[in-house]
């Protein structure tokens, strides 16, 4: 029986409890999950690619079938290189759906053999976004319910 490998891509700047929830759900459904941390230089991330990979690796270290890798370039090329059959995407709200639906359609046009699988996070994570977490932290707000203690500590150090 073949192993089902999927890729969960994102910038993860920083990785939030919502991201973590999606990864853990995917890890329960699929044999192998690759968390693909995008370089995303155009987004001017708070953390470097290596820092984001390190944070995600640390937070997900208890998941034996999860691997965290950085990548740059076209996602579908990375997915093929990994030998994955599908991309996992998180949907928080209807506003995410339109963009994700368009992206899934474009990916299917370019790579017909790839599937996109949508997962929704637990209710308490539905409205968490990395950009909102960064904004709250920059304004000295409490982000503890949105990120792990390790991420909160690293953000505090970045903003010091």
UniProtKB/Swiss-Prot annotation:
Recorded catalytic activity of this chain's protein: (R)-4'-phosphopantetheine + ATP + H(+) = 3'-dephospho-CoA + diphosphate
Record key words, sorted: ATP-binding, Coenzyme A biosynthesis, Cytoplasm, Magnesium, Nucleotide-binding, Nucleotidyltransferase, Transferase
Marked site positions, Transition state stabilizer: 19
Any one of the GO BP annotations: coenzyme A biosynthetic process
Gene3D superfamilies attached to this UniProt entry: HUPs
Binding site for substrate: 11, 43, 75, 89
Enzyme Commission (EC) number: 2.7.7.3
Record flagged with keyword Transferase: yes
Pathway membership: Cofactor biosynthesis; coenzyme A biosynthesis; CoA from (R)-pantothenate: step 4/5
Enzyme class: transferase
Requisite cofactors: Mg(2+)
Gene Ontology, cellular component aspect: cytoplasm
CDD domains, sorted: PPAT
Superkingdom field: Bacteria
Keyword Glycoprotein in annotation: no
HAMAP family membership: PPAT_bact (MF_00151)
Similarity comment: family membership: Belongs to the bacterial CoaD family.
Subunit structure comment from the entry: Homohexamer.
Entry-linked NCBIfam families: coaD_prev_kdtB (TIGR01510), cyt_tran_rel (TIGR00125)
Function: Reversibly transfers an adenylyl group from ATP to 4'-phosphopantetheine, yielding dephospho-CoA (dPCoA) and pyrophosphate.
Name of this protein: Phosphopantetheine adenylyltransferase
Organism whose genome encodes this protein: Methylobacillus flagellatus (strain ATCC 51484 / DSM 6875 / VKM B-1610 / KT)
Lineage: Bacteria, Pseudomonadati, Pseudomonadota, Betaproteobacteria, Nitrosomonadales
């Amino acid at each position: 029986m073949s192993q089902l490998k999927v890729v969960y891509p994102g910038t993860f700047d920083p990785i939030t409890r919502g991201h973590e929830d999606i990864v853990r759900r995917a890890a329960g459904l699929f044999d192998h999950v690759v968390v693909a941390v995008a370089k995303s230089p155009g987004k001017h991330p708070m953390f470097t690619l290596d820092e984001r990979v390190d944070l995600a690796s640390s937070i997900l270290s208890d998941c034996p079938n999860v691997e965290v890798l950085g990548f740059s370039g076209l996602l579908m090329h990375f997915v093929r290189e990994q030998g994955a059959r599908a991309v996992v995407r998180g949907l928080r709200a209807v506003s995410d759906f339109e963009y994700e639906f368009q992206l899934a359609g474009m990916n299917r046009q370019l790579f017909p053999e790839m599937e996109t699988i949508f997962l929704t996070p637990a209710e308490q994570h539905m409205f968490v976004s990395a950009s909102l977490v960064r904004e709250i932290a920059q304004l000295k707000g409490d982000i503890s319910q949105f990120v792990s203690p390790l991420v909160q500590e690293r953000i505090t150090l970045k903003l010091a």
